[in-house]
Amino acid sequence: MYYIGIDLGTSAVKLLLMDETGSIANIVSREYPIAFPHPGWSEQDPADWWAAVCDGIPALLDGFDASQVKGIGAGGQMHGLVVLDKNDAVIRPCILWNDGRTQRQVDYLNGVIGKDKLSRYTANIAFAGFTAPKLLWMRENEPDNFARIEKIMLPKDYINYKLTGVHCTDYSDASGMLLLDVEHKCWSKEMLDICGVQESQLPKLFESWQPVGTLTAEAAQMLGLPADVVVCAGAGDNAAAAVGCGAVGGGKCNISLGTSGTVFITSDTFGVDKQNALHSFAHADGGYHLMGCILSAASCNKWWSEEVLHTTDYAAEQTPITADKLGANDVYFLPYLMGERSPHNDPASRGAFVGLRMDTPRAALTQAVLEGVAFAIRDCVEIARAQDVKIKASTLCGGGAKSPLWREILANVLGIPLTPPQTEQGPGYGGAMLAAVACGAYPSVQACAEALVHAKSTTQPDAALVEKYNARYAVWHKLYPALKVSFAEMEALQ
């Protein structure tokens, strides 16, 4: 038996074929474009996602018996606004998670409606990437399009709709819309009223592992699959990645070094960050989690290496950063290339190198980029620690986690052991696991994780190096407050 996992990312979809033992039989990826129609805007055509899935799944199954595929589960980029009309046609391009156009709407929600009310309604405050501010923006700036909305969806839910014909979402992904009462797992009437939408315009809610339907005849024919393949609700990318790393059940932590970076802390019970810096979301295992999200993580290293240094050989750039250089770098980097969410909630914040001298070598800047991302992740960890959340160790995933140097830097910046899973496929693997649960192969997500997820070698922190990084983090931590006003002034000049 096989299960297909779909990782609907920002730049590509990654498709994964998993057998009943948890082994990955095949992986295929298909890229699609991102449009930046105005500074700070970020959009995609949902048709490109579906075309990539339709092209990729037959390639994924090449050489395999498609009749043995039993289920499909998707993990997808969160927060994106997909709107359909009465004919289920896409009304406008999807406004993505990293789109920054909604600051005025965020200010209205947090300032006029008020953070206390938002937290009471949804367990969260407004952030520029969330879905509700995008609905307000659309109502104000595209009223004709807004009036045509029949269904509001998230990116991976659009794929599930194309697979099954069912308008659905799951609790983990819906948590990031600012429309869900996270504690009670239902749509918030207050938030729907604020945004001017009806509950009938929203998809049906499911737990991540629950089946939402089987393939339509059209989808089955296009993909070369049996029509009785079960499709589960799936999860937001971070929740799916946590499942794929084994971070299920209470008291676990998973850190992701993907395009964005996350600190994902699981809990069996509902809880809210009193500082409103961490998100309080539902988890794909039926529980809850606190999550800090930095908008630029591995993407910072990609930008630095490819756009500035004009190289894709990341390992070669990191080779000069020897052990004696760790904890001794006098160059600091703020990784706010797309603004920042946790903990600053500041779309105007920007990237910066601080501490350059005439004798600063190229490798010191590369090291500063890796350390700056690690320090930003520590910002999120420190907020959790301030609320007596004990983080003694963490699993680790994402493209950046493949770098031994970055793992070592992060382990020492955080002062905790970091362990990537043997299968480093994040949301796609988690999606396939959820599909296996939906098909009855395992009684629960936790049972599936215990059976399939196995640890790789652990990167341990070094006490002396932890002390050095503590001192440098204290310096780095003061840089954003010192530059905040300047960032706002730069934004005003645009």
Residue ranges and their predicted role:
Residues 4-5, 103, 110-127, 133-168, ...:
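Active-site core segments that coordinate phosphate-bearing ligands/cofactors
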Residues 26-30, 203, 457:
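Structural signal for short hydrophobic segments within the conserved structured cores
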Residues 1-92, 120, 148, 220-221, ...:
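N-terminal glycine/serine-rich phosphate-binding loop of ATP-dependent small-molecule kinases
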Residues 15, 81-84, 93, 265-266, ...:
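Short glycine-/acidic-enriched loop or helix-start segments at secondary-structure transitions
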Residues 92-106, 421-422:
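Short, acidic/small-residue loops that bind anionic groups at enzyme active sites
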Residues 58-97, 125-131, 160-181, 204-207, ...:
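Short beta-strand-loop/turn "lid" adjacent to the catalytic site in phosphate-handling enzymes
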Residues 22, 45, 72, 99, ...:
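Residue-level signal for inorganic ion chemistry
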